[in-house]
């Protein structure tokens, strides 16, 4: 009897201990799962917060680069404008005594190359972008860029209903052109057609695992026999037409064919100098009348708002606006800029006049496009 009672108590004790162990394990497992979920949630939250923080820093850097205002001022403007960068720039400039641009060109997080080609009465300038310098310098990338540059030169890329000589500043024209390029048959270096440009581009993307794409594109066709076409590539990477930045320039010279017989070297040298100035000074238009009128109106509104607290008569305010607009034009208009290749402090327009007079030429700048990899102009 005692022995059986002892066994019964022992069995109950063992069963109770087993249940306690099982419950403990289950509780521990549940706690562990909960802890893991909390860690994951914290990690995701931290990553999202870090991403948001990085994006905000990029916006602040962009605004500061354009306005040269303090980080605090830029941050306050960004918050007030609900993270709208363009509106924040306007707000900073309106609230600043000196509302002029510090720079119209800002950095972008992209690598790539520029290529230009010229043939008889046509010239093209094209930009190919990717994520890393390593890929941009790869022979496959360079070859692809050169091949599509030739394709653009020989084929009708821009539809007949659009002015082929529209500047790249016309964003719709550039988009239409790039879409047409992507659909065009791709001819390799051996003259063989291998699918379309789009298919070849996807092939390169799969090889390099990077976001390779056509950035900007511009093409110009001569309007008359007096137009002289020229390109200049800076920081050359391959041959003489592929590099990190490039300018496509069109100048009109009276009796061009006759003048080229005796002045060709001088004309080419002068065109090169103008291109180097354009790369350095980064103008957005040839002359004042060719500046986008929306940009002009926006600029005048910003200047007027920045002067609203001065309590001056309207005629004085108008004179001040005109003075600031003159300074604005001297920063962004080619012919109004101070020539950067010497220390004479002459305007580009005066440099052209002096060269024309010294060489018995009549020169007018008709058109230019300026592409710099990793930079974009906020007025374009």
UniProtKB/Swiss-Prot annotation:
Q: Per the similarity annotation, which family is this? A: Belongs to the EF-Ts family.
- Report what the protein is called: Elongation factor Ts, mitochondrial
Organism lineage string: Eukaryota, Sar, Alveolata, Apicomplexa, Aconoidasida
Q: Which UniProt keywords apply?
A: Elongation factor, Mitochondrion, Protein biosynthesis
Extra remark beyond the main annotation:
This protein may be expected to contain an N-terminal transit peptide but none has been predicted.
From what organism does this protein derive?
Plasmodium chabaudi chabaudi
**What would you give as a GO molecular function for this chain, any one?**
translation elongation factor activity
Domain of life here?
A: Eukaryota
HAMAP family, alphabetized: EF_Ts (MF_00050)
Q: Per the record, what is one GO cellular component?
A: mitochondrion
Role played: Associates with the EF-Tu.GDP complex and induces the exchange of GDP to GTP. It remains bound to the aminoacyl-tRNA.EF-Tu.GTP complex up to the GTP hydrolysis stage on the ribosome.
Q: Supply the SUPFAM superfamilies for this chain.
A: Elongation factor Ts (EF-Ts), dimerisation domain, UBA-like
Q: Name one GO biological process term.
A: mitochondrial translational elongation
Q: Which Gene3D superfamilies match?
A: 1.10.286.20, DNA helicase RuvA subunit, C-terminal domain, Elongation factor Ts, dimerisation domain
What the entry lists under Pfam families is as follows:
EF_TS
> Which InterPro entries does the record cross-reference, listed alphabetically?
EF-Ts_dimer_sf, Transl_elong_EFTs/EF1B, Transl_elong_EFTs/EF1B_dimer, UBA-like_sf
């Amino acid at each position: 009897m005692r022995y059986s009672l002892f066994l019964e108590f022992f069995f109950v004790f063992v069963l109770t201990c087993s249940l306690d162990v099982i419950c403990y394990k289950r509780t521990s497992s549940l706690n562990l799962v909960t802890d893991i979920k909390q860690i994951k949630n914290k990690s995701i939250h931290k990553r999202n917060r870090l991403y948001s923080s990085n994006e905000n820093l990029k916006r602040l850097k962009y605004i500061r680069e354009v306005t040269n205002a303090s980080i605090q001022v830029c941050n306050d403007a960004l918050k007030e404008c609900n993270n709208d960068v363009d509106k924040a720039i306007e707000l900073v400039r309106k609230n600043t005594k000196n509302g002029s641009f510090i720079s119209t060109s800002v950095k972008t997080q992209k690598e790539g190359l520029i290529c230009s080609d010229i043939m008889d009465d046509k010239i093209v300038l094209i930009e190919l972008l990717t994520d890393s310098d390593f890929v941009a310098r790869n022979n496959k990338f360079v070859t692809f860029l050169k091949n599509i540059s030739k394709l653009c030169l020989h084929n009708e890329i821009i539809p007949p209903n659009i002015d082929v000589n529209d500047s790249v500043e016309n964003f719709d024209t550039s988009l239409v052109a790039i879409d047409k390029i992507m659909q065009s048959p791709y001819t390799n270096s051996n003259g063989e057609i291998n699918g379309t440009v789009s298919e070849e581009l996807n092939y390169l993307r799969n090889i390099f695992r990077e976001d390779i794409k056509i950035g900007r594109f511009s093409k110009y066709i001569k309007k008359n026999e007096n137009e002289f076409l020229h390109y200049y590539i800076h920081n050359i990477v391959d041959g003489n037409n592929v590099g990190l930045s490039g300018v496509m320039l069109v100048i009109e010279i009276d009796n061009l064919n006759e003048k080229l017989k005796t002045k060709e070297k001088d004309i080419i040298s002068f065109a090169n100098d103008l291109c180097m100035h354009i790369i350095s000074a980064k103008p957005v238009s040839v002359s004042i009348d060719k500046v986008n009128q929306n940009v002009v109106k926006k600029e005048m509104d910003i200047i007027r708002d920045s002067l609203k607290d001065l309590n001056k008569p309207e005629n004085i305010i108008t004179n001040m606006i005109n003075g600031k607009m003159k300074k604005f034009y001297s920063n962004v208009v080619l012919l109004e800029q101070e020539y950067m290749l010497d220390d004479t402090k002459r305007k580009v327009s005066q440099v052209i006049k002096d060269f024309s007079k010294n060489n018995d030429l009549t020169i007018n700048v008709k058109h230019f496009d300026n592409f710099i990899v990793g930079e974009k102009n906020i007025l374009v």
